[in-house]
């Protein structure tokens, strides 16, 4: 299956940002008033074909964005390689590991949907098993409407404390 045929979670921009009253650029903490309203809107997600959403700024694709902090308090930083899924990000640096979210059939809450997706991405991207990501902490959101990628994506930010030996890069250059 092509990555563009993947069924992903999106939220209508007008619903997510309350007709732009809650729009922001940068990082928004979970306890901020806008952050709380945006979190509430996440439960109104829809499932759409990724290829149809890549150029449609009327929807925001939800992305898990996981910060990995080691036992010394250092945050992982890495360069996005050509083997990664989003060509427009190749060669750029990132402090977040993650990717597109999918529906979780049978999930009891939006919290479960977010966590299951973040844990799946951690396993895929850096080999971090579920039992080693249980200390995952939801921090808030990142958004950047100033570039083509950011106009159609919004990151749900988590922080996970890990041991350096538990993390291994899975992505390679092609």
State each model region's role.
Residues 59-63, 70, 90-96, 153:
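Short connector loops at helix/strand junctions that flank enzyme active sites
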Residues 64-65, 73, 93, 116, ...:
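Generic beta-strand structural signal
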Residues 1-38:
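Intrinsically disordered, charged low-complexity linkers and terminal tails
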Residues 24-74, 80-84:
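Acidic, metal-coordinating catalytic segment for phosphate/diphosphate chemistry
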Residues 3-13, 52, 62, 81-83, ...:
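Active-site segment of metal-dependent pyrophosphate-handling enzymes
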Residues 167-174:
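NUDIX/MutT-family hydrolases
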Residues 74-120:
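Conserved Nudix-box catalytic region and its N-terminal flanking loop in Nudix hydrolases
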């Amino acid at each position: 299956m092509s990555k563009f045929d993947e069924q992903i979670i999106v939220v209508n921009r007008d619903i997510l940002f309350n007709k732009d009253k809650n729009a922001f650029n940068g990082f928004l903490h979970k306890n901020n008033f806008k952050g709380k309203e945006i979190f509430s809107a996440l439960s109104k997600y829809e499932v759409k074909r990724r290829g149809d959403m890549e150029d449609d700024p009327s929807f925001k694709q939800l992305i898990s964005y996981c910060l990995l902090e080691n036992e010394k308090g250092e945050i992982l930083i890495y360069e996005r390689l050509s083997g990664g899924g989003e060509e427009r990000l190749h060669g750029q640096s990132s402090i977040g590991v993650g990717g597109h979210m999918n529906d979780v059939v049978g999930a009891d809450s939006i919290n479960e949907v977010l966590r299951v997706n973040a844990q799946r991405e951690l396993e895929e991207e850096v080999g971090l098993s579920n039992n080693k990501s249980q200390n995952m902490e939801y921090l808030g959101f990142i958004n950047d409407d100033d570039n083509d990628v950011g106009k159609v994506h919004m990151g749900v930010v988590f922080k996970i404390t890990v041991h350096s030996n538990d993390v291994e890069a899975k992505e390679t250059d092609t």
